[in-house]
Design a protein with these regions (language model features):
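DPxDG-like acidic metal-binding loop motif
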Residues: 84-95, 99-120
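Short acidic loop-to-helix transition motifs that present clustered carboxylates
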Residues: 67-69, 174, 193-200
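Short, charged, surface-exposed secondary-structure boundary motifs
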Residues: 122, 200-202
Length: 203
């Protein structure tokens, strides 16, 4: 059964790509116009139109937007034609909405898709601690570790001294303590205003 699911999802790859492309096209219509909600609204509209034609029995279990009162998919929204594999989606039609509205780089359309029941649904009324790295250290770190332990472990796996190791993080007031701890650790730090998914891809 697991192999069948993998084959089915692999076959969906072109359709999933069309969904994110549609979101990006919708957002691109309003790049630099200073209206983040319009960027979001068009990205949602365009991606929903493609999802409606996608041969899946799908459900949106989580999406970016509601906590910011921005245009978004509805949680538990049913999507797809109702034919094909049962899947669930986590959707962010535009990560970096503000960046797109100001004509800046690193806005990106993203989604995750898995067989129904695979994703853990978390409350979407707050922020979560996230770490992105490459395959070298993915099995060596956990959220039970301190930020210092995580950074040291990833740097060791990459065979880098801390002074040559770079951490990218969003510049937010809520990250002030983590930023202070990282500076004490001696790593290089790049603070970005938006677009942490694009930063994660860069790792």
């Amino acid at each position: 059964w697991e192999r069948m699911c993998l084959v089915s999802l692999r076959a969906l790859a072109p359709s999933l790509t069309r969904i994110t492309v549609a979101a990006a096209v919708g957002a691109a219509l309003h790049i630099g116009q200073g209206n983040p909600d319009l960027v979001d609204a068009k990205a949602v509209e365009f991606s929903r139109a493609v999802l409606t034609q996608t041969d899946v029995e799908g459900e949106v279990i989580s999406c970016e937007g509601p906590k910011d009162n921005a245009p978004a998919f509805m949680r538990r929204e049913k999507v797809g034609t109702g034919k094909g594999p049962k899947v669930e989606f986590v959707l962010d039609p535009v990560d970096g909405t503000t960046a797109a509205s100001k004509g800046r780089k690193d806005a990106i359309s993203a989604l995750a898709c898995a067989p129904a029941g695979c994703f853990q649904v978390l409350p979407d009324d707050g922020y979560y601690f996230k770490v992105a790295t490459d395959y070298h250290s993915v099995n060596s770190i956990s959220f039970d570790m301190s930020i210092e332990e995580i950074v040291r472990t990833v740097a060791d796996e990459k065979r880098l001294h801390l002074e040559n190791f770079t951490v990218i993080m969003l510049e937010r007031d809520r990250h002030a303590e983590i930023l202070q701890r990282l500076r004490k650790l001696g790593v290089r730090i790049i603070l970005i205003p938006d677009g942490d998914i694009a930063a994660a891809v860069a790792t």
